[in-house]
């Protein structure tokens, strides 16, 4: 028998087994992503990306930027979140299937809170996380990396290349 849920239990004293499972999942995700902390209480990868973008916003930097090489379904969810909150959304173009960082460097990034990239991206290509992180951080924004947890066994982790937030879909794990 298997129990799967996107919900966090409200009564910790009667949910120790579920809490133990969530703790072990979060520990594994931290190891895979190279990040210090993990959350397990969002519905899916697209929602996680939208929540991460909302987390990065502040009064001076409220614009969300998403690479065009991110899964269109994820972009759609982020667009919905931005519409509901009134956050401006910018889609950064792609070039040869990868995030076009020349476009990033040419734009005014003073109001951009974060850039969301996906690696491997929607086209199956691996983004250059370190150079993207460098450019994004030099502009004062945060980098959100959306990644496939299975691919993280082979690829440089978001923590290694300097992402501020890592998000992903749990479905590839089974």
Regions found by a protein language model. Name each.
Residues 1-48:
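Conserved N-terminal alpha-helix of the aminotransferase class I/II PLP-enzyme fold
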């Amino acid at each position: 028998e298997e129990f799967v849920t996107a919900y966090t239990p409200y009564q910790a004293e009667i949910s120790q087994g579920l809490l133990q499972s969530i703790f072990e999942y979060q520990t594994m995700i931290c190891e895979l992503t190279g990040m210090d902390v993990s959350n397990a209480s969002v519905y899916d990868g697209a929602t996680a990306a939208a929540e991460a973008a909302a987390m990065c916003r502040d009064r001076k930097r409220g614009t969300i930027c998403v690479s065009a090489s991110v899964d269109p379904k994820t972009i759609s969810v982020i667009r919905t979140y931005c519409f509901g909150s009134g956050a401006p959304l910018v889609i950064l173009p792609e070039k040869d299937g990868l995030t076009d960082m020349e476009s990033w460097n040419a734009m005014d990034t003073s109001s951009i809170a974060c850039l969301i990239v996906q690696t491997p991206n929607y086209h199956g290509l691996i983004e250059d996380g370190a150079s993207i992180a460098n450019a994004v951080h030099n502009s004062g924004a945060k980098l959100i990396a959306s990644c496939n947890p299975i691919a993280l066994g082979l690829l440089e982790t978001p923590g290694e290349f300097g992402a501020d937030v890592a998000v992903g879909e749990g479905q590839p794990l089974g």
